[in-house]
C-alpha cells in the first residue's frame, strides 16, 4: 500500500495513550487539542517546556466557499427548526449546480472507460472530506459492481489515519502528493483530483505529476474560477457558493462532490456493461439480503418465477450475469459464459451473439 492509499475495509488501529498500558486505546481527540488537555497543539498557555510555538504557514484562501452566506448570518440566533430549514434550503441548490457540469462529467466518464478497457486504472486523490468521499466511492464499487480491486484506487492525504481524524498539514504537502502519484500512476491511467477549493497542494501535486507521467487528469471542485482549471484534461467546477457555516466545505461543496462521484462512477459501470436495464447484474452477494436481491433481479429481468431464478443461479454457481444471459437466451450456462467473454462482458451483446 502506498503512503496515502486507503485499502477498503482496513480502518487504522486505535492509538495507544502514551501513559497507558500498551494494549489500551482512547477515542480520537478533537482535532487541534492534545490528549492531555494542556492547551493548543502549538503549546500556547499549556506548553510544558517553556518554548515558543513554531511558526506555521498561513494561507488566505480566495474561494466562493470562504464567503459569508447572507441567508445564514443569524444562524446562532435561530431555533433548531430554522437552522435545519436554512441548511435544507441551501442543500437544494446543489443538484441544480451539478446539472450545469454534466457535459464535463460525461467527458470524464469516457476517459475512465477508455482507461479501464485498456487495462489501466482510475485514481482518486483528495484531502480531508474530499479525500474521504473518494475512498467511499472507490470502496463501494466492488460490492456493487464486482469491480477488480485494481480498477479504482483512492489516495488520501495523511494516509489511512486521515479517514478518522485530521492529519496535521497533510493537505499542504504538494511534494507528498506528487511523490505518491509517481509511485502508482502509469501512462494511460486517469487521475481524479478532489479539492473543494480547487487549490489543495497535495491534490495539485498529484495532478501535476500524473500529467507528467502521461495520465489524463480531472479536477472536481466547488470553485468554477479555480486557476488549476487550465492545467487538467477535464475541469469540473460546481458553483455551490458560500456555505451555511462559512468555509465548512463538508456541507454543500462535499454534497456536490458526492453527487458528481455518484454519477461519474455509476455511468462508468453502465458503459462497461455492469448494469442491465437499471439492474445490478455484477453485484457480489455477501449477505442474505443481497442473495435475495439476486433472485429478485432475475425475476424482474426475465419474468420468471423465484424457483426458476434460484435454479438458474445454482446452475451458474452464483454467477448472476451468466444466469441472466442463460435465462434470456435459453442457452446453457456454459454457452452464456462463452458469449459474455466474446462480447466484452455485455449482456445485450452476448444475447445477440447467441441469437445469431
Predicted regions and their residues:
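Glycine-rich phosphate-binding loops that contact phosphosugars or nucleotide phosphates
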Residues: 122-272
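Cofactor-/ligand-binding subdomain signature composed of acidic, glycine-rich
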Residues: 2-5, 44-97, 101
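A short, well-structured juxtamembrane/interface segment
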Residues: 100-117
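Intrinsically disordered, low-complexity terminal tails and inter-domain linkers enriched
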Residues: 4-54
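Short, amphipathic alpha-helical interaction segments embedded in low-complexity terminal/linker regions
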Residues: 263, 268-356
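Charged, alpha-helix-enriched surfaces in structured cytosolic catalytic cores
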Residues: 103, 107, 201, 255, ...
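Gly-rich Lys/Arg/Thr-decorated short loops/hinges at beta-loop-alpha junctions or inter-strand turns
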Residues: 86-94, 154-165, 276, 317
Amino acid at each position: 500500500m502506498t503512503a496515502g492509499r486507503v485499502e477498503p475495509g482496513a480502518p487504522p488501529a486505535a492509538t495507544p495513550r502514551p501513559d497507558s498500558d500498551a494494549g489500551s486505546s482512547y477515542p480520537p481527540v478533537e482535532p487541534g487539542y492534545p490528549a492531555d488537555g494542556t492547551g493548543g497543539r502549538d503549546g500556547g498557555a499549556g506548553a510544558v517546556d517553556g518554548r515558543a510555538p513554531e511558526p506555521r504557514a498561513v494561507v488566505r484562501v480566495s474561494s466562493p466557499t470562504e464567503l459569508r452566506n447572507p441567508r445564514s448570518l443569524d444562524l446562532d440566533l435561530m431555533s433548531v427548526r430554522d437552522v435545519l430549514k436554512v441548511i435544507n434550503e441551501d442543500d437544494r441548490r446543489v443538484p441544480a449546480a451539478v446539472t450545469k457540469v454534466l457535459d464535463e462529467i460525461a467527458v470524464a466518464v469516457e476517459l475512465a472507460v477508455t482507461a479501464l478497457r485498456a487495462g489501466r486504472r482510475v485514481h482518486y486523490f483528495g484531502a480531508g472530506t474530499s479525500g474521504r468521499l473518494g475512498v467511499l466511492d472507490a470502496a463501494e464499487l466492488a460490492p456493487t459492481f464486482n469491480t477488480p480491486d485494481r480498477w479504482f484506487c483512492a489516495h488520501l492525504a495523511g494516509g489511512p489515519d486521515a479517514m478518522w481524524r485530521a492529519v496535521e498539514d497533510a493537505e499542504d504537502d504538494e511534494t507528498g502528493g506528487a511523490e505518491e502519484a509517481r509511485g502508482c500512476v502509469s501512462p494511460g491511467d486517469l487521475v481524479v483530483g478532489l479539492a473543494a477549493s480547487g487549490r489543495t497542494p497535495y491534490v495539485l501535486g498529484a495532478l501535476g505529476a500524473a500529467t507528467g507521467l502521461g495520465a489524463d487528469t480531472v479536477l472536481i471542485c466547488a470553485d468554477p474560477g479555480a486557476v488549476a482549471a487550465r492545467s487538467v484534461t477535464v475541469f469540473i467546477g460546481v458553483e455551490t457558493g458560500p456555505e451555511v457555516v462559512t468555509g465548512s466545505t463538508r456541507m454543500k461543496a462535499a454534497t456536490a462532490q458526492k453527487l458528481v462521484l455518484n454519477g461519474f462512477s455509476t455511468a462508468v459501470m453502465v458503459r462497461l456493461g455492469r448494469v442491465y436495464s437499471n439492474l445490478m447484474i455484477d453485484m457480489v452477494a455477501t449477505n442474505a439480503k443481497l442473495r435475495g436481491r439476486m433472485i429478485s433481479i432475475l425475476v424482474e429481468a426475465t419474468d420468471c418465477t423465484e424457483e426458476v431464478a434460484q435454479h438458474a443461479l445454482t446452475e451458474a454457481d452464483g454467477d448472476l450475469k451468466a444466469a441472466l444471459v442463460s435465462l434470456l437466451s435459453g442457452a446453457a450456462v456454459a454457452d452464456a459464459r462463452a458469449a459474455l467473454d466474446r462480447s466484452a462482458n455485455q449482456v445485450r451483446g452476448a444475447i445477440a451473439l447467441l441469437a445469431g
